Amino acid sequence: MDLHNIREDYSKQELSQAHCHADPIQQFEQWLEEAITAKANEPTAMNVATVLDGKPTSRIVLLKEVNPNGFVFFTNYQSRKGQAIEQNPYAALTFFWAELERSVRIEGRIEKISAEESDRYFASRPYTSRVGAWASNQSQVLSGKSELVAKAALIAAKHPLHVPRPPHWGGYIVLPERIEFWQGRPSRLHDRICYRLVEGKWHKERLSP
């Protein structure tokens, strides 16, 4: 399959270092709000990359909170990503908003959030999603789809109203050490503004595309 001629020339906006926030979290929040306003497809979807047994692995996960400390998502702690994080507590996140010709890359240490925070979020989920968290042994082999459906039915019968949070399910927060903002520009002369955390302070610099 020849893909050589598939390309786009980006020209919608430019990214000025002088106009970027001093705090990259604030810059991210601004860009995320603009992606939501522009009705970008799945604006909170991000690629989460981890390393397990020395090999990189990645998957798409939804961002559920951004705060001054970092970026929060929820998952099954016994999944492959959970195993990778247990073994190597660092992750890289990538957001891509094609509608705005923008991308954000985030790298940092990752740790579990408190059980209380996970409980609050789990309680806010739809009933069927809470049932699914119990029914799915994420990343494990199934004999067939019917096995999963039957298990979900058993969980629903056991918990017709209140579904408690499984102990193996909860949130992680990525504590950023490096955040890069990418804005597509004509002739592949893209804008790249990178923030690095050095001794507790953010340093901002422009990178060559």
UniProtKB/Swiss-Prot annotation:
Entry binding sites for substrate: 7-10, 64, 121, 125, 129, 188-190
Pathway annotation: Cofactor metabolism; pyridoxal 5'-phosphate salvage; pyridoxal 5'-phosphate from pyridoxamine 5'-phosphate: step 1/1; Cofactor metabolism; pyridoxal 5'-phosphate salvage; pyridoxal 5'-phosphate from pyridoxine 5'-phosphate: step 1/1
GO molecular function: FMN binding; pyridoxamine phosphate oxidase activity
Record bears the keyword Oxidoreductase: yes
Cofactor(s) annotated in UniProt: FMN
Cofactor note: Binds 1 FMN per subunit.
Keyword entries, A-Z: Flavoprotein, FMN, Oxidoreductase, Pyridoxine biosynthesis
InterPro entries found in the cross-reference section: Pyridox_Oxase, Pyridox_Oxase_CS, Pyridox_Oxase_N, Pyridoxamine_oxidase_dimer_C, Split_barrel_FMN-bd
Top EC group: oxidoreductase
One Pfam family linked to the record: PNPOx_N
EC number: 1.4.3.5
A GO biological process held by the record: pyridoxine biosynthetic process
Record family assignment: Belongs to the pyridoxamine 5'-phosphate oxidase family.
PANTHER family xrefs: PYRIDOXINE-5'-PHOSPHATE OXIDASE, PYRIDOXINE-5-PHOSPHATE OXIDASE
Protein name: Pyridoxine/pyridoxamine 5'-phosphate oxidase
Lineage: Bacteria, Pseudomonadati, Pseudomonadota, Gammaproteobacteria, Pasteurellales
Gene: pdxH
